[in-house]
């Protein structure tokens, strides 16, 4: 079985949540082939992931544009979301083609939604693992904005 895992590079928490799950999966399914896409440092991945994996150094989300570790740059984040969704159907089609070429049996994200949309278009099963998600955070900060409808 081939598992494609997309881990948000927005901090280290997404890896901290995902790594124990992946390590446990590999223990019960040692022949599991894993492809991981993230921009997190390879050294950090090697500390947390106790199995061989193919690394795709890329990011499918940005989370939020941050001023510092605890403050969101709301105007910059709003602009980034508008840009990310300006041509959403084309982005989803590109992601679906990427996933179809990669041929995973399952797509797992923590917690980018682009791979979920691409997997749906490509007819691949997918799921997300997280203690939070961008949709709820987005609604908290931007639901009142006309452009966010």
What are these regions (language model features)?
Residues 1-51:
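N-terminal subdomain of nucleotide-sugar transferases
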Residues 4-6, 108, 129:
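Structural motif
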Residues 19, 119-122, 140:
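Short amphipathic alpha-helical segments
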Residues 30, 102, 122-124:
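Helix C-cap/helix->beta junction micro-motif
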Residues 32-86:
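Conserved nucleotide-sugar phosphate-binding/catalytic loop shared by glycosyltransferases and other
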Residues 44, 107-121:
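An aromatic- and histidine-rich active-site surface loop
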Residues 72-106:
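Conserved nucleotide-sugar donor-binding subdomain of glycosyltransferases
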Residues 125-149:
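Active-site-proximal region of nucleotide-activated glycan assembly enzymes
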């Amino acid at each position: 079985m081939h598992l494609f895992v997309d881990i948000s590079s927005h901090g280290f928490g997404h890896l901290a949540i995902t790594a124990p799950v992946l390590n446990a999966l590999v223990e019960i399914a040692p022949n599991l082939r894993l492809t991981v896409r993230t921009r997190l440092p390879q050294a950090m991945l090697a500390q947390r992931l106790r199995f061989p994996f193919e690394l795709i150094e890329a990011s499918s989300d940005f989370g939020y544009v941050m001023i510092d570790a605890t403050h969101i740059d709301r105007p910059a984040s709003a602009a980034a979301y508008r840009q990310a969704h300006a041509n959403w159907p084309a982005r989803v089609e590109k992601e679906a083609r990427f996933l179809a070429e990669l041929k995973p049996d399952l797509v797992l994200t923590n917690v980018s939604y682009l791979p979920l949309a691409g997997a749906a278009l490509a007819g691949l099963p997918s799921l997300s693992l997280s203690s939070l998600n961008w949709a709820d955070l987005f609604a908290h900060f931007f639901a009142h904005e006309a452009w966010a409808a």
